[in-house]
């Protein structure tokens, strides 16, 4: 290969390349593929600039041979091929004279006509892949990227190829010739396979001063200095016999490695006890909306105005009564609270001008429901540190609950399609990086699959409620503000629709710390009769408040309308995360992207289109007692989204612990499935760590039961 490079390339290029490699401590005689790659890249940069000039009128022209005295300036400044110091000097002087933003990495060329730096890439792989790597590495809008491949493909930022067809054809022809010359000498395969991704050079990082002293103090025992410890870590071979490694780490550790076989794992033990209950901050599948289409009333967009308008669409109100009391609460207070909301809404309507916000009267029932004056008085620690029997008051262990079928139904519902669209196409954010085309295409396909999904409705509902509650908590700290629970969507025909799910009344909210709690009472409409699954509604008092006429196949039927009322609480940090629930869209899009990337790398081309448009193919969605469930790509998108949304709606310490610990067991089981002969020590301890998170949380219990299905099928 070295001989080929010296024959094939201009001696000046070879010399510059040797100099550059030596600057980075690389030997052209040993790293021959790299030698060839750098020469090729340098030659492409030179060819890119050849014959391109700017005349006295600042027009760009091509001159192959002409009057040597013409006042022509080179269109491109060549930066590649200079030593680092010189290259940075050139870049800095260009930035100073033109005002262009200074790049983070040394680019290859500067274009005086377009006033931009250019990064040239020459790849033996797929142009898209290399383009993405370049874009990710330089992370700059301003630097233009132009990638050529040895197969004649090219890709450039915003499909703006800078040069005319003919100049680019010269470059492509030259690359093709190099490839053929290599192939005829049997060098091409090794050259093609040797391409590494873009590497970013790590800076040497010195620690000095206080940090250095802290580092020396915090070393593990038996190490005298940071250098000493670093040398040990660098020399630590991660593969090899684990027992030996453990004894090398510490004399006290001894671990017997047990082989992990198909018969080793047992199912997770799910807790016994009464069935678990609903604990989300708002109703999910059981929610009922009062809606207005094409809202155009006065004050449209002001929540209170929208809510009153929605309330007026319903005519079946009746005297409310309790149909499912709350076991521990003073139920008549919940009833009075609803009556108070109706009365105060009526009062608003009788006023001349409807106010933008409504603060409820501080009645006995609301004070009770919002826990006013219930919190023990806070005493400064200084005043009581001398009390002899000072202790934290006892709190009961949480009561164990068993898995109930309702949570699986909730999840199934969240994966379904509704007949409305809950996000616009651009909800997942505009393109920022220059990976425009593929990224937009994936985003648009994905959005089309999930925009009508019920989980997306939950996202928008969660964002709305948390935003409104956080705003009110800061703006009206002492007031019992009435907050309508609203969402907006578009119907199949594209008409706008505003929906009211019910109301929240916020308690006092002097939130100093992130974890300080604000209490609220939620009142939500529903057609679900709570007596069908009373265990699900343990935390609610449910009223019957009206009758609703529903259109069915057999004509109109009247169904009782219920109001689910409960006391609840949240904190600044929880509301902050609730406001950011749109991240779930991004998380599930990234999971889908990694599936597409895997497909694409097998097929060696971007598979986005085929992935979403091949309707006949099915994909694994999850495990159930019946086996591996499969479904269309849309179903996969919606299932991943629903999982992400439920992780947000049912976030809890139990979920954090379960996810972290069960993942370890999952990886071991997958290693066994891939015939990697995994070994474990203290498997009992791992089971204990997982099972201590299985207490009473419905979403965690459901995940644990899915995990058991996975274990059963994975290890058959």
Swiss-Prot record:
EC number in record: 3.1.-.-
Primary site of residence: host cell
Job of this protein: Plays an essential role in viral RNA transcription and replication by forming the heterotrimeric polymerase complex together with PB1 and PB2 subunits. The complex transcribes viral mRNAs by using a unique mechanism called cap-snatching. It consists in the hijacking and cleavage of host capped pre-mRNAs. These short capped RNAs are then used as primers for viral mRNAs. The PB2 subunit is responsible for the binding of the 5' cap of cellular pre-mRNAs which are subsequently cleaved after 10-13 nucleotides by the PA subunit that carries the endonuclease activity.
GO molecular function list: endonuclease activity; metal ion binding; RNA binding
Record note on quaternary structure: Influenza RNA polymerase is composed of three subunits: PB1, PB2 and PA. Interacts (via C-terminus) with PB1 (via N-terminus).
Keyword annotations from UniProtKB, A to Z: Cap snatching, Endonuclease, Eukaryotic host gene expression shutoff by virus, Eukaryotic host transcription shutoff by virus, Host cytoplasm, Host gene expression shutoff by virus, Host nucleus, Host-virus interaction, Hydrolase, Inhibition of host RNA polymerase II by virus, Manganese, Metal-binding, Nuclease, Phosphoprotein
Protein name as it appears in the record: Polymerase acidic protein
Source organism (scientific name): Influenza A virus (strain A/Chicken/Hong Kong/96.1/2002 H5N1 genotype Y)
Subcellular location: Host cytoplasm; Host nucleus
Motif (Nuclear localization signal 1 (NLS1)): 124-139
Segments carrying motif Nuclear localization signal 2 (NLS2): 184-247
Residues that, per the record, bind Mn(2+) 2: 80, 108
UniProt modification remark: Phosphorylated on serines and threonines by host kinases, including human casein kinase II.
Cofactor-binding details, from the entry: Binds 2 manganese ions per subunit.
One Gene Ontology biological process: symbiont-mediated suppression of host mRNA transcription via inhibition of RNA polymerase II activity
GO cellular component: host cell cytoplasm; host cell nucleus
UniProt record similarity statement: Belongs to the influenza viruses PA family.
Necessary cofactors: Mn(2+)
Pfam family, one: Flu_PA
Residues reported in the UniProt entry to bind Mn(2+) 1: 41, 108, 119-120
């Amino acid at each position: 290969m070295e001989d080929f490079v010296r024959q094939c390339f201009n001696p000046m290029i070879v010399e510059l390349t040797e100099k550059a490699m030596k600057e980075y401590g690389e030997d052209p005689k040993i790293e021959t593929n790299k030698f060839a790659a750098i020469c090729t890249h340098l030659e492409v940069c030179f060819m890119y600039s050849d014959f391109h000039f700017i005349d006295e009128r600042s027009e760009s022209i091509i001159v192959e041979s002409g009057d040597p005295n013409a006042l022509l300036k080179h269109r491109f400044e060549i930066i590649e091929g200079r030593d680092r110091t010189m290259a940075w000097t050139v870049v800095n002087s260009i930035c100073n004279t033109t005002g262009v933003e200074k790049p983070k990495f040394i680019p290859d060329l500067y274009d005086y006509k377009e006033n931009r730096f250019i990064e040239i890439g020459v790849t033996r792989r797929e142009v898209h892949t290399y383009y993405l790597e370049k874009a990710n590495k330089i992370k700059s809008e301003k630097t233009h990227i132009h990638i050529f491949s040895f197969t004649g493909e090219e890709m450039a930022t915003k499909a703006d190829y800078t040069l005319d067809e003919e100049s680019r054809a010269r470059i492509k022809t030259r690359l093709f010739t190099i490839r053929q010359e290599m192939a005829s000498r049997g060098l091409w395969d090794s050259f093609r396979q040797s391409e590494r991704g873009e590497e970013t050079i790590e800076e040497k990082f010195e620690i000095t001063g206080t940090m250095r002293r802290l580092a020396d103090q915090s070393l593990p025992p038996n190490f005298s200095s940071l250098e000493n410890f670093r040398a040990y870590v660098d020399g630590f071979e991660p593969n090899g016999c684990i027992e030996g490694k453990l004894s090398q780490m510490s004399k006290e550790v001894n671990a017997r490695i047990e082989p992990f076989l198909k018969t080793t794992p047992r199912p997770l033990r799910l807790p016994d006890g009464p069935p678990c209950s609903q604990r989300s901050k708002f109703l999910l599948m059981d929610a009922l909306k009062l809606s207005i289409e094409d809202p155009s009333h006065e004050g449209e967009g002001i929540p209170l105005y929208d809510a009153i308008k929605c309330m007026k669409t319903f005519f079946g109100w009746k005297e409310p009564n309790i149909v499912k009391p709350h076991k521990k609460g003073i139920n008549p207070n919940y009833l009075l609270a609803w009556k108070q909301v109706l009365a105060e809404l009526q009062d608003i309507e009788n006023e001349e001008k409807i106010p933008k916000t409504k603060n409820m009267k501080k009645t006995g029932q609301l004070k009770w429901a919002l826990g006013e004056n219930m919190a023990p008085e806070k005493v400064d620690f200084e005043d009581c540190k001398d009390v002899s029997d000072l202790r934290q008051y006892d709190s009961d262990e949480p009561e164990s609950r068993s898995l109930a079928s309702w949570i699986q139904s909730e999840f199934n519902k969240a994966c379904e399609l509704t007949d409305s669209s809950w996000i616009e196409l651009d909800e997942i954010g505009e393109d920022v990086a220059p990976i425009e085309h593929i990224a937009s295409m994936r985003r648009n396909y994905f959005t089309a699959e999930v925009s009508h999904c019920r989980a997306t409705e939950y996202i928008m509902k969660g964002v709305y409620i948390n935003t409104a509650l956080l705003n009110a908590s800061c703006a009206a700290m002492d007031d019992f503000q009435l907050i309508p629970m609203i969402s907006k969507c578009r119907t199949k025909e594209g008409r706008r629709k505003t929906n009211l799910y019910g109301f929240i009344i916020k308690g006092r909210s002097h939130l100093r710390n992130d974890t300080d709690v604000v209490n609220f009472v939620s009142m939500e409409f529903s057609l679900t009769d709570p007596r069908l699954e009373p265990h699900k509604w343990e935390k609610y008092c449910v009223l019957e408040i009206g009758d609703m006429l529903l259109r069915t196949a057999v004509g109109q039927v009247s169904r009782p309308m219920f109001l689910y009322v409960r006391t609840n609480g949240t904190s600044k940090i929880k509301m902050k995360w609730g406001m950011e629930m749109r991240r779930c869209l991004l998380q599930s899009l990234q999971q889908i992207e990694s599936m597409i990337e895997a497909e694409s790398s097998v097929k060696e081309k971007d598979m986005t289109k085929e992935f979403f448009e091949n309707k006949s193919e099915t994909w694994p969605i999850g495990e159930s007692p019946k086996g591996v469930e499969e479904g269309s790509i849309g179903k996969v998108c919606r299932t991943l989204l629903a999982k992400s949304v439920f992780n947000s709606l049912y976030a809890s310490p139990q979920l954090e612990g379960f996810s972290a610990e069960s993942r370890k067991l999952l990886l071991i089981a997958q290693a066994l499935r891939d015939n990697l002969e995994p070994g474990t020590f203290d498997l009992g301890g791992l089971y204990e760590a997982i099972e201590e998170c299985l207490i009473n949380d419905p979403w965690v219990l459901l995940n644990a039961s899915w995990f058991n299905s996975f274990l059963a099928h994975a290890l058959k």
